[in-house]
């Protein structure tokens, strides 16, 4: 199921971002916390979609993938800001951006599939 894969990839991104705290350039008051919150918001939406597909939640609530896309777009912006402020290296930026872009593309595909089913 695509939602399980998305959730795992989001978890991997969250872990990778959380591990940034171990670098000396990252302080507690940086954009990392905002980035983590946005990732968790996307995870919540993907989890809700999985539950609806499994029938454990009311399908009439619907899943708003556009909201998830907005959060992922913000994640991509936070990642770029971390590079601009030199909080992360270009190498780490590339890795995080690649992960975020992959998730964004799959969410975008899910959004298209969802709207065509309705």
PLM region spans:
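Amphipathic alpha-helical assembly/interaction segments
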Residues: 1-118
């Amino acid at each position: 199921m695509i939602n399980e894969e998305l959730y795992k990839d989001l978890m991997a991104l969250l872990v990778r971002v959380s591990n940034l705290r171990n670098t000396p350039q990252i302080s507690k008051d940086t954009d990392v916390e905002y980035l983590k919150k946005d990732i968790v918001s996307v995870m919540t939406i993907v989890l809700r979609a999985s539950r609806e597909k499994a029938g454990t939640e009311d399908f009439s609530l619907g899943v708003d993938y556009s909201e998830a896309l907005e959060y992922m777009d913000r994640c991509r912006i936070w990642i770029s800001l971390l590079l601009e402020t030199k909080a992360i290296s270009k190498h780490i930026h590339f890795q995080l951006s690649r992960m975020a872009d992959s998730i964004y593309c799959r969410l975008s595909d899910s959004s298209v599939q969802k709207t065509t089913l309705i």
